[in-house]
UniProtKB/Swiss-Prot annotation:
Binding site for Mg(2+): S54, T189
Reported function: Guanine nucleotide-binding proteins (G proteins) function as transducers in numerous signaling pathways controlled by G protein-coupled receptors (GPCRs). Signaling involves the activation of adenylyl cyclases, resulting in increased levels of the signaling molecule cAMP. GNAS functions downstream of several GPCRs, including beta-adrenergic receptors. Stimulates the Ras signaling pathway via RAPGEF2.
List of residues binding GTP: 47-55, 182-189, 208-212, 277-280, 369
Name of the featured protein: Guanine nucleotide-binding protein G(s) subunit alpha
InterPro entries from the UniProt entry: Gprotein_alpha_S (IPR000367), Gprotein_alpha_su (IPR001019), GproteinA_insert (IPR011025), P-loop_NTPase (IPR027417)
Span of the signal peptide: none
Listed Basic and acidic residues bias regions: 8-23
GO biological-process terms attached to the record: adenylate cyclase-activating adrenergic receptor signaling pathway; adenylate cyclase-activating dopamine receptor signaling pathway; adenylate cyclase-activating G protein-coupled receptor signaling pathway; sensory perception of chemical stimulus
Segments for region (G1 motif): 42-55
Species, as recorded: Sus scrofa
Any one Gene Ontology cellular component term annotated for this protein: cytoplasm
Annotated PROSITE patterns: G_ALPHA
Length: 397
């Protein structure tokens, strides 16, 4: 006599069969997802604020994700106008605060300064024609230009000159930003942003996180399964201070941050690709530094001023530094620029070699994040390094 308790209806058997097939599909998909995950190169962009990390991400979009469409460009118009407004406001506001202060070359422009300062904190500013008129006239004033040349003494966005030079273009009603405009546009990064792209059928995920001090606590969320860290440095920031405290030297902040990442116990096996960024601005500063020392009088006191800051004013060891034998200057590069950029490189390499244990390495590259061809070339050079790191990550090498 059969046991009725073990008998199954046709419907039950069909349901179990369907469940087994569903489980197989899920298992197969999980296996596929695991393979895709393991085959993906995850790159974590780190660095201090305003070093150029987000610009690197934009370049990856231009180079590998079909760039920016019309809608995306349209949404950036307001950000670009805000950059322009912030630039002229910051410069004219700084003129009276510098020591010695800077005066307008044309005193008749004072009413324009008054206008710019009066709209500083206006919410939802609508950029009327008179704003562009006043901004352009002030930007052409030699006193305003002199204040701009001393921008290391206050906090000014890097794109200030670029957008102030384009006032006549930006003010047009039918203005459409170029790729270069989008690369130059500065928007504070807050949080974590992921960009996915593919190069020669290899998947890359690039994570961009805010670089300001209060954003860095979020970095640890991104450390898991990272293939490589791209650490971005504003090489031109040797004579500037960070926004957070207006005291700490920006390049020294980057060196301290690099040291903390290099020695982080969670990252001891993760190699670092070092992007020594803003080489164009570094070259400008170094070459401007050849200006002679000037004297000025303020309140019957004699002051000595270098119109442009020398690296040794901030890093005294630069005075004893000689260009290394492994230096490979760019064609036509001034020897002073070569010496400066390799000094900065070697400051970072001193950190990596001092505490290196053979489990991770530092690969330096000189970059200009707003130069698409430079980033294309550098990233192509880095791909073999990243591939090797990826193979080592999964113990295939």
């Amino acid at each position: 006599m059969g046991c009725l308790g073990n008998s199954k209806t046709e419907d039950q058997r069909n349901e179990e069969k369907a469940q087994r097939e569903a489980n197989k599909k899920i298992e197969k998909q999980l296996q596929k997802d695991k393979q895709v995950y393991r085959a993906t190169h995850r790159l974590l962009l780190l660095g201090a604020g305003e070093s150029g990390k987000s610009t690197i991400v934009k370049q990856m979009r231009i180079l590998h994700v079909n760039g920016f469409n019309g809608d995306e460009k349209a949404t950036k118009v307001q950000d670009i106008k805000n950059n322009l407004k912030e630039a002229i406001e910051t410069i004219v506001a700084a003129m009276s605060n510098l020591v010695p202060p800077v005066e307008l070359a044309n005193p008749e422009n004072q009413f324009r300064v008054d206008y710019i300062l009066s709209v500083m904190n206006v919410p939802d500013f609508d950029f009327p024609p008179e704003f562009y008129e006043h901004a352009k006239a002030l930007w052409e004033d030699e006193g305003v230009r002199a204040c701009y040349e001393r921008s290391n003494e206050y906090q000014l966005i890097d794109c200030a000159q670029y957008f102030l030079d384009k006032i006549d273009v930006i003010k047009q009603d039918d203005y459409v930003p170029s790729d270069q405009d989008l690369l130059r546009c500065r928007v504070l990064t807050s949080g974590i942003f992921e960009t996915k792209f593919q190069v020669d059928k290899v998947n890359f995920h690039m994570f961009d996180v805010g670089g300001q001090r209060d954003e860095r606590r979020k970095w640890i969320q991104c450390f898991n399964d990272v293939t490589a860290i791209i650490f971005v440095v504003a090489s031109s920031s040797y004579n500037m201070v960070i926004r957070e405290d207006n005291q700490t030297n920006r390049l020294q902040e980057a060196l301290n941050l690099f040291k903390s990442i290099w020695n982080n116990r969670w990252l001891r096996t993760i190699s670092v690709i070092l992007f020594l960024n803003k080489q164009d601005l570094l070259a400008e500063k170094v070459l401007a530094g050849k200006s002679k020392i000037e004297l000025f009088v303020l309140d019957d006191r004699l002051f000595q001023e270098r119109p442009f800051s020398f690296i040794e004013d901030y890093f005294p060891e630069f005075a004893r530094y000689t260009t290394p034998e492994d230096a490979t200057p760019e064609p036509g590069e001034d020897p002073r620029v070569t010496r400066a950029k390799y000094f900065i490189r070697d400051e970072f390499l001193r950190i990596s070699t001092a505490s290196g244990d053979g489990r991770h390495y530092c690969y330096p590259h000189f970059t200009c994040a707003v130069d698409t061809e430079n980033i294309r070339r550098v990233f192509n050079d880095c791909r073999d390094i990243i591939q090797r790191m990826h193979l080592r990550q999964y113990e295939l090498l």
